Amino acid sequence: MEKKESERPVVKNDSVAPTMAKTEQTIDKSRRVCTLSHAMIEMLVKQLGAELSNHNLYRTFANYFSCQGLPKLEEYFILRADEEDNHHNWILWYLNYNDAEFQYPRIEAINVDIPNRAYPFEATVDREIETTESINKIVKQAIQEGDWATEAWLKGNDDEHGKLVLEQIEEESISRTMLKWQMRTLTGKLNRILS
């Protein structure tokens, strides 16, 4: 039997493997030190501070309800504060994992007058909306930069290292639910007083 030439054409690869000279010309050399851009580090550090501020605000509300003799609401706000600390830890981990050198931002004192028992719930909804908007800006920045790793981390679902976008869906939902509950409670009490 006669040997036939292969009917399948041979794929020829004319491309040249990158040389170190080409690599040196094309890479972003700043990534040798840190994979995050300066703008991304600034945004994440700002969010790190915002999470600590949220923590302190919710601890302030916990103290208020403790002094009002409402330990269940105190406990609720302590748990909310703990969540904010967890978010802070996720951001800290990500910054450290990417070798981002930074200084902690200044955290302003919580100077808030609490005029009534509904206010902490209203303020919490507003603070969580603000937090969501801030995180969304970080996602947009990551997309604009083509920083797919940071985008994936922000949108991730990892209890240990982070899931900030998903977490904000939950945070806003819980905050709105508790505000509605508080408003129904106050309306019910007012109706009983007026009847």
Where are these regions (language model features)?
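Iron-associated oxidoreductase/ferritin-like identity signal
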Residues: 1-195
